[in-house]
Design a protein with these regions (language model features):
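Conserved thiamine diphosphate
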Residues: 99, 109-115, 166-204, 248-277
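Long, amphipathic alpha-helical stalk/connector segments used for oligomerization, subunit docking
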Residues: 207-214
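Glycine-rich, charged/polar anion/phosphate-binding loops
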Residues: 131-134, 200-207
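Cofactor-binding active-site loop characterized by glycine-rich and histidine/acidic residues
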Residues: 1-148, 155, 159-177
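Flexible loop/turn segments at secondary-structure boundaries
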Residues: 15-19, 126-127, 153-157, 196-198, ...
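Conserved acidic/glycine
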Residues: 1-6, 221, 225-228, 232-321
Length: 321
């Protein structure tokens, strides 16, 4: 549903999104982690930003515009949570204007304003003021944007009950829901482990927003974390045993596996081969990215050592002891 010409405005959890639209490879992901300064190896920021800060290139090397309607686009991520929201609104507003106004030279930028702006945000960041400001403006202007709210019931260690009224952002925003008399948002909810309904939900979201320029909220619930918020954290410290047991049973990857088996799309042995091969692919990408990062350093060191040796010999000629 993320079609050519569309724009993403997300945050630093969207590596799967970027790989799905073929704008990120595993090697590039690890090159970002290693802060490789070679723009060809780390095209997102040449090592200047924290890992998983994504973008796509909008300009050719000569400074002219690329044909944006024939590529999948992403605005450049920044680290402040919630900061993707104003950019999301602006990108959606651009499509609105392209449909409304008869502008010149729009061939590379829009096809009748059909381009949807796709946003992503974590449930905890929906407590920020900028989130509500943007939703209000998007509802007033009726712009084509789809905002996905990834909800794992926690904001790092803080539960929804301690930060979100009604413990549900979609329920809290229910007054934004459009009806037959007044414009507003279309609010959709779906569980993150429910693959068929995810497909149906996002297809519906895209069709409504693209054709009618109606903003959409997709509240994706019951997401799980395989580990804590970061590799240095431990969710065992703030989640109950009951919650952790529930997450093990409802892990999205596990649920996807069950769905594949239940629908006889593949058998157990085939999935095991895929899983094992996938692990090897990731390991090899990691090694390749690390070696590519090290090679220029190793070569520079090799070139420097003879120079230092020559300097040492030259210095010793003067016998300055």
């Amino acid at each position: 549903v993320f079609q050519k010409g569309a724009f993403r405005s997300g945050y630093y959890r969207d590596q799967t999104f970027m790989m799905a639209i073929n704008e990120l490879t595993l090697k590039q992901l690890f090159s970002g982690l290693y802060a490789n300064t070679d723009i060809n190896e780390e095209p997102m920021s040449a090592g200047r930003q924290m890992g998983a800060h994504f973008s796509t290139v909008s300009l050719n090397e000569d400074g002219s515009w690329k044909d944006l309607i024939n590529q999948r686009n992403s605005s450049s991520d920044v680290s402040c949570t919630g900061s993707q929201m104003p950019r999301l609104l602006g990108l959606a507003q651009a499509s609105k204007l392209y449909r409304k106004l008869k502008t010149k030279n729009k061939n590379k930028f829009s096809v009748n304003g059909n381009e949807v702006a796709w946003g992503t945000i974590g449930n905890a960041s929906t407590s920020e003021g900028v989130f509500f400001e943007v939703l209000n403006a998007a509802g007033v202007h009726q712009v084509p944007m789809v905002i996905s709210i990834w909800d794992d019931d926690y904001g790092i260690s803080v539960e929804n009950k301690d930060q979100t009224i009604k413990q549900s952002i979609s329920e809290a925003l229910s007054g934004f829901q459009r009806n037959s008399k007044k414009d507003g948002f279309e609010i959709l909810t779906v569980n993150g482990w429910d693959y068929p309904n995810l497909i149906n939900t996002y297809q519906k979201a895209n069709d409504i927003s693209r054709e009618k320029h109606i903003p959409i909220i997709v509240h994706v619930k019951e997401l799980t974390q395989p580990i804590g918020h970061s590799t240095s954290g431990s969710h065992e410290r703030y989640k109950s045993k009951e919650r952790l047991d529930w997450e093990k049973k409802n892990d999205c990857n596990l649920k996807m596996r069950e769905w594949i088996l239940d629908n006889k799309i593949a058998i157990q042995s085939e999935l095991e081969v895929i899983e094992n091969d996938s692990k090897e692919i990731v390991k090899n990408a990691k090694k390749d990215a690390w070696q590519t990062y090290l090679n220029p350093i190793i070569n520079s060191r090799k070139n420097l050592i003879p120079i230092l040796n020559d300097l040492s010999e030259e210095f010793n000629k003067y016998n300055l002891d």
